[in-house]
Amino acid sequence: MAFKYHKVAIIGKHYKKEVSQMVETLYAYLQQQGLEIIIENDTAVDTSLVNVAIASLKEIALRCDVAIVVGGDGNFLKASRLLALYSNIPVIGINKGKLGFLTTLAADDNALKNDLYAILKGDSSVTKMSMLKCRVDNNLRAPLEASIALNEIAITASRGLMFGLKVFIDGRYAFDQRGDGLIVSTPTGSTAHAMSAGGPILNPNQNSVVLVPICSHSLNSRPLVISDESVIDIYITDYNDPEPVLSIDGRHDTILKAHQKVTIQKARKKVTVLHTKDYNYYDTLREKLGWSKVLF
C-alpha cells in the first residue's frame, strides 16, 4: 500500500537535546521510506543535519501533507494550534516529554516501524480537537494567534486577592462568583488546568466546554458543562479593586480591570490529530491517571 502522506514536516522543541536526537532519527527513517521531509526552522538549528529543507510553521501548514511534532504536550499544544490557524493539516505527536496526553506515539524504533508507518500509510484513527477564541471589550483587532486556545482560557487572581466575576451564557445571566478565578476549557483542556481545579474530564469528541471555578468563596459554586455553541460573556466586577490576569493556553497574559468584558466562544478551526487505528482515549486516561491501579 502506497503512502497517503508524501510531504512530511518535523517539528521539535527548541534547545532540547533528546528531542533533537529523536528528530535526527525520525528524519533518517522517513528518508529511508522515500518521503519528502521539511523541518521547522528552529528545530533544524538544533540538529546536526545539513542540506535539509526548512520552513516556518505557516509554510509547513500550507505546503505539507502532515506534521509530526516531537516533544511533550506543551510543544504539541503550541505547534498544532498555530498550524490549525493556517490549514487543516493533520498532526501526529511523538512523546519526548513527561505525561503524553496529546503526544500518543512512543519515541522508540517499534513505534516508528509499526505505528508511525501505518499512520503514514493511512491506517489511522482521527480526533478533531475543538478550540476557543476570546476577545476583550469586543476588540476584534487582536492577532488571531494570540486569541485562540486549544486547552483553556483562564482568568486568575494576580495579587493574591480574590475578585468577582459576573457570567452570562448566550446573553442570559448565569451566575456571580468571588474567588481566585475561572477556567473555560475545551474537552482537550479538561485533563489539564481544569482537572487540577476539580473540573470533569470530557471526551475530546464531545461538543462541550466546561466552566471551572478556581477556589470559589462559596460552597455552591460548581463546574458547569455547556454546549460549545454557546457564547460566554464574563464581566470583571469592582470587588477588591481587581487586576486579574487573562491567560490563553498559559500565554499572552493580559491584565484586566473592573468592568471589562471577556467574550469566549468556539473557534471555527479545529486541530486534526492522527492516532493508531486501535487508539483508545480511555486507555490513555487509565495509563496517565493511574486508574485501576492498586494503591496499597
From Swiss-Prot:
Signal peptide stretch: none
Keywords: ATP-binding, Cytoplasm, Kinase, NAD, NADP, Nucleotide-binding, Transferase
Name of the protein: NAD kinase
GO cellular component, one term: cytoplasm
Gene name tied to this protein: nadK
Annotated GO biological process: NAD metabolic process; NADP biosynthetic process
Residues binding NAD(+), per UniProt: 73-74, 78, 151-152, 178, 180, 191-196
Family annotation (SUPFAM superfamilies): NAD kinase/diacylglycerol kinase-like (SSF111331)
Organism: Francisella tularensis subsp. novicida (strain U112)
